[in-house]
């Protein structure tokens, strides 16, 4: 079958046009007009991902984070980042990117986060189109800030969790309304605040932004960017279901390579 058939099914679920303005999306490397036998799902395209794809004979990678997100000035093999692109092209591996559209689409990444944490009666944080938006906010079983932090740490299997608060008393504050945005969602914290969030969960919170959040009366949890790795398992499961429903004769492989650059001691 053609790679384009897989992507046609994917875009019926998660249209490219749902992406935020200026986002990197869609086919970035190779062609979809080719026969494929193996599709791999990954969070990132790094050296480890490419090596795995080559070893396993992968023809198409569906990835969340675009490998090309800065202007390319040359393709000199002496630059490690360029070698990633060169190896993909050399081995005829197509790369398709699904970034903010999977964050925004219904039953996409942010809804999966809500299901994992028990956040219910949700709506989006910021509108990005007709009846759709980025981030989610909803209600959760009443608990303390500390209890929510422990739940987040356990659910996402984290070795550490950054908590945004000043006073020890904050740990016992009652929490019932929670906002969440995968990735780097600090720019939406005022939307979370405006919609009544007690706590905002997002990654990559800056030092001064954390202070601003607290001044505005909003607690926060920063589990990091890598919680988005559930993209791999979830999309691989969807592709496997479509394979069964549509009779595709291809292999679906969730990437086993860890691309998390952070570890804590």
Swiss-Prot record:
Keywords from UniProt, A to Z, are: Metal-binding
Q: Which positions does UniProt annotate for a divalent metal cation 1 binding?
A: 103, 228
InterPro entries referenced in this protein's UniProt entry, alphabetically:
DUF34/NIF3, DUF34/NIF3_sf
Q: Where does a divalent metal cation 2 bind?
A: 65, 225, 228
Could you cite one Gene Ontology molecular function of this protein?
metal ion binding
Q: Which SUPFAM superfamilies match?
A: NIF3 (NGG1p interacting factor 3)-like
GO cellular component terms listed in the entry, alphabetical order: cytoplasm
Q: Which domain of life is it from?
A: Bacteria
Subunit organization: Homohexamer.
Describe the family membership recorded for this protein in Swiss-Prot or TrEMBL.
Belongs to the GTP cyclohydrolase I type 2/NIF3 family.
* Protein name in UniProt: GTP cyclohydrolase 1 type 2 homolog
